[in-house]
């Protein structure tokens, strides 16, 4: 398989993974917002999940940028 096709496939996989992580992060964000609106302390686990998902998204976003740049140089 050509390098361009491999990069395009990997980019597509990363985008899917990021979309899934963003959905999970949105659920945690909703729980955190509910706590804020209800004027109560947020659950520690929700804060940890939010931070974890955010960190994973950032790592994948950096990888996506890197792969996209590589793909642009091949075109």
Regions found by a protein language model. Give the residues of each.
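Short, charge/polar-rich alpha-helical segments
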Residues: 1-23, 48-55
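Short, low-complexity interaction segments enriched in Ser/Thr/Pro/Gly
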Residues: 2, 57, 67-69
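A periodicity- and composition-biased signal for non-globular, repetitive helical segments
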Residues: 10, 30-31, 45, 66-69
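Interface faces of extended alpha-helical assemblies
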Residues: 17, 24, 31, 56, ...
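Short E/K-rich amphipathic alpha-helical oligomerization segments
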Residues: 19-51
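Long amphipathic alpha-helical coiled-coil segments
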Residues: 61-75
């Amino acid at each position: 398989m050509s390098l361009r096709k491999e990069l395009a496939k990997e980019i597509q996989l990363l985008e899917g993974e990021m979309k899934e992580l963003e959905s999970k992060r949105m659920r945690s964000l909703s729980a955190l917002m509910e706590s804020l609106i209800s004027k109560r302390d947020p659950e520690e686990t929700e804060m940890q999940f939010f931070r974890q998902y955010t960190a994973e998204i950032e790592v994948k976003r950096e990888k996506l940028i890197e792969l996209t740049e590589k793909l642009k140089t091949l075109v």
